[in-house]
């Protein structure tokens, strides 16, 4: 699976960013999504946004999964983790 960074669009006013970040992995599982998973979550309450580190076979697969649980997406970027040399 490929790794992605997902930046949400501004969440609706009634959605708490921290709750969204915490619940999104479970929401994907409960929605029966098996081809995408969220591995890390971050929230920015003042901006009303969340950021996810996710894995999926393709960008479109991940976008479809997030749309299924009503997470508004601003961008999805395929990434490769690079560890700095110490």
What is each PLM-predicted segment?
Residues 1-32, 39, 44-48, 81-86:
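Short S/T/G/P-rich N-terminal loop/turn motif that feeds into the first structured element of a domain
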Residues 9, 53-55:
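Short hydrophobic/aromatic beta-strand micro-patches
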Residues 31-34, 55-86:
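An amphipathic, aromatic/His-enriched active-site/gating alpha helix that lines ligand/cofactor pockets
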């Amino acid at each position: 699976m490929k790794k992605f960074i997902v930046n949400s669009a501004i969440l609706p006013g009634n959605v708490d960013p921290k709750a969204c970040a915490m619940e999104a992995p479970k929401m994907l599982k409960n929605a029966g999504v098996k081809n995408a998973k969220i591995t890390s979550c971050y929230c920015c309450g003042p901006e009303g946004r969340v950021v996810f580190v996710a894995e999926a076979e393709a960008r479109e697969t991940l976008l479809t999964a997030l749309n299924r649980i009503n997470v508004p997406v601003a961008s999805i970027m395929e990434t490769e983790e690079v560890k700095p040399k110490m």
